[in-house]
Amino acid sequence: MTRDDKFPIVYSLLLIVLLFVSPIYGDGDADALLKFKSSLVNASSLGGWDSGEPPCSGDKGSDSKWKGVMCSNGSVFALRLENMSLSGELDVQALGSIRGLKSISFMRNHFEGKIPRGIDGLVSLAHLYLAHNQFTGEIDGDLFSGMKALLKVHLEGNRFSGEIPESLGKLPKLTELNLEDNMFTGKIPAFKQKNLVTVNVANNQLEGRIPLTLGLMNITFFSGNKGLCGAPLLPCRYTRPPFFTVFLLALTILAVVVLITVFLSVCILSRRQGKGQDQIQNHGVGHFHGQVYGQPEQQQHSEKSSQDSKVYRKLANETVQRDSTATSGAISVGGLSPDEDKRGDQRKLHFVRNDQERFTLQDMLRASAEVLGSGGFGSSYKAALSSGRAVVVKRFRFMSNIGREEFYDHMKKIGRLSHPNLLPLIAFYYRKEEKLLVTNYISNGSLANLLHANRTPGQVVLDWPIRLKIVRGVTRGLAYLYRVFPDLNLPHGHLKSSNVLLDPNFEPLLTDYALVPVVNRDQSQQFMVAYKAPEFTQQDRTSRRSDVWSLGILILEILTGKFPANYLRQGKGADDELAAWVESVARTEWTADVFDKEMKAGKEHEAQMLKLLKIGLRCCDWDIEKRIELHEAVDRIEEVDRDAGGGQESVRSSYVTASDGDHRSSRAMTEEFSLM
């Protein structure tokens, strides 16, 4: 047999192997799940698990008839068994053989006993949700040592005791840790993760000093622990030993005696000096003091500012000390080149627009400040200037992805943007370690706040016409970004309800747009919304349709009134788990009940609302090839707006797809479509 004759045989054998291997993996997942089910009590609620069908089915292996099982590319990636009245002692050892398992949630059941056996064997797990059960006992300090992929751990609402496992503080990717409402004792271990956003230990029995790395977190995360102290709680008291107290008192008395002696000596010497020389010296000292250390009225202004935050004061003090030699006129205009006086240039507030009131960095830092929010990138403050104007200062910590000149160029490019649905950038401040971006303050606040915050008397309700107006404006602003940034894969990159502000007429204004090029890659992938799209979580890539995915999530949020992050504590939240949230909307019976009741829309609007719901679902289709492109979403939303009696103007004429420059008319895009 010749060498050429052997090739068909080899290929045939390979084909046979592939045909057999594929179902083996599927059967392996099924066997593991059935073995796990056999260890549960009251498992009758697990519908479809005994159907004889594989857990993952469909053309691309992304569908599952097994209740609570989520699949991707033919393998199980998440197990979500919540509110099913399951009980007994949980044993997850059988799940260790499911290679692609990234997330498990057993929240709000009746499991008891110690932390599930075999949990440390799930080394690929990224999300662990065991909250609101009846687990008890101590957790071994090294339990999580081998689970390096963990991003989110939710153990709240149980009766765990003993010390918080030190291995949690050593998980390199950890961003979220919820341990509230347990019985943990001892001290909080050290947490040094750079991307850590939440460590909630409220309502335990912890004591000692809060680690410095957690000092900027929300104060409520540490409430209900009588023994805790340190930022953000009250300072810790230090009880000195008696000997140290006596020694300190003696040292103080000695210092006072020395100071009195020095003072008397200076007085005697000063009287012997000439009057003219004395005047010259006094004038020189006073002039120097005024230049370097500032004016008394500045100190009074700072002391009177009741809203000023400690973090903002720290930033102001650091900057004032660094910039103490800068003059009050050190202010830059948009045309300044980054090559001009690079050292002095870093002390300036650079304005990128010529239609805004000018103020200096010192003016801004002297203003009374109010903390608006804090997130993965940094913090936001409202600064009330002495002129009466209010601005928002956003302090970013992870903007070193490009060099100084490229940063200047990109900020000036953003400053030149002009669209009714974009909040314009006013100015920026550059330092290598941190950046400040300044925008106007919008009193109505964010869409997220109006959708989800507790209702206050007299607050405007977002009815159907307003919500449609918001969707239309958001889409138009996004289409404009797509047109002016044809080379950016993610023209917005961080589209979410908290980044949509509403002006007095409830016209939406997009914020935090076009920042992907300047944000560090690790942080952008960790925190920016576009990187939660399934094509990135599964294939490590983004596309021009990733922002469309974010738009779809936003449309569903606006229509249902449900905040995706609320599902985080129920195992339905960020990252790949948004699939379950979207799926829950898609599978809900499409009646008026799916919509937020606060919209108060009549039956005459139901057809338009359902049409917009379909558009939202098409925008966030899990399959990127089936997901509609932005130009199609624009056309469909404009059609809904026209059907509802909205404005006749369209943004289609100004939008061009980046891939093919397609100029298809709106009419060609308005045919009825089917989702299922």
Curated annotation (Swiss-Prot):
The chain crosses the membrane at residues 243-263. It is found in: Membrane. LRR repeats lie at residues 98-122, 123-146, 148-171, 172-195, 197-218. Its main location: membrane. This is Probable LRR receptor-like serine/threonine-protein kinase At4g31250. It is a single-pass type I membrane protein. ATP binds at residues 372-380, 394. The modification Phosphoserine is found at residues 368, 446, 543. Residues 1-26 form the signal peptide. Belongs to the protein kinase superfamily. Ser/Thr protein kinase family. It catalyses: L-seryl-[protein] + ATP = O-phospho-L-seryl-[protein] + ADP + H(+); L-threonyl-[protein] + ATP = O-phospho-L-threonyl-[protein] + ADP + H(+). It comes from Arabidopsis thaliana (Mouse-ear cress). GO terms for molecular function: ATP binding; protein serine kinase activity; protein serine/threonine kinase activity. The lineage of its organism: Eukaryota, Viridiplantae, Streptophyta, Embryophyta, Tracheophyta. It holds the Pfam family Pkinase. Residues 319-330 have a biased composition (Polar residues). Glycans are attached at residues 42, 73, 83, 218. Keywords: ATP-binding, Glycoprotein, Kinase, Leucine-rich repeat, Membrane, Nucleotide-binding, Phosphoprotein, Receptor, Repeat, Serine/threonine-protein kinase, Signal, Transferase, Transmembrane, Transmembrane helix.
